[in-house]
């Protein structure tokens, strides 16, 4: 009887150790990986978004496009190409007018719903979006603090997350930012985080961003990063970005 109990105890200990070892192995595997999310805001545009898609597809690289509904409505073919190319799609806003969007929580909610409706109508799908990017980011200074706080609570009530970025390529600092400057902005800080989210823009006047894209892709490939869409984010990546206040920053 004593030997029987002893064997059971040993079996339980081995089982527990095995489970813990598995968890450790999974965590170790995650820590060894490096993930980058290339994100493009404010499009799609007439031709620049297509040029970006050409580069992404040529390199077999995935990225995520944060869509302005009114621009999607004006460039339906490009919007469909984004979807058909297997790129990520996040609602950004319907009309990129900060004062109107951030006038109230209701204004933001109505604009976001219209953006989602527009995207789904063009790609002929009924998607449910669980991640968005807020215009100007979740800590923008255009929106009042009270309204911004209420918007975040509203998104939470809908089980919708919001994502910012770890790296800003700086292509909105002026109308046209030199390719070399964009490249340097990325190279100065890339590779410092396990999961990186790069902010870029694909409006028609952001062609220098497109010109720098191949160099940016090369940099991340040389650093051993995987390129993914935000929709393909794994739980450990989500938790990592939460802990670094890139997702759902209060």
Predicted regions and their residues:
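N-terminal pre-catalytic segment of deacetylase/amide-hydrolase enzymes
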Residues: 1-39, 44-60, 74-80, 179-184, ...
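Active-site beta->alpha N-cap acidic-glycine motif
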Residues: 26-134, 219
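Catalytic domains of cell-wall/extracellular-matrix polysaccharide-remodeling enzymes
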Residues: 96-199, 203-221, 225-226, 232-233, ...
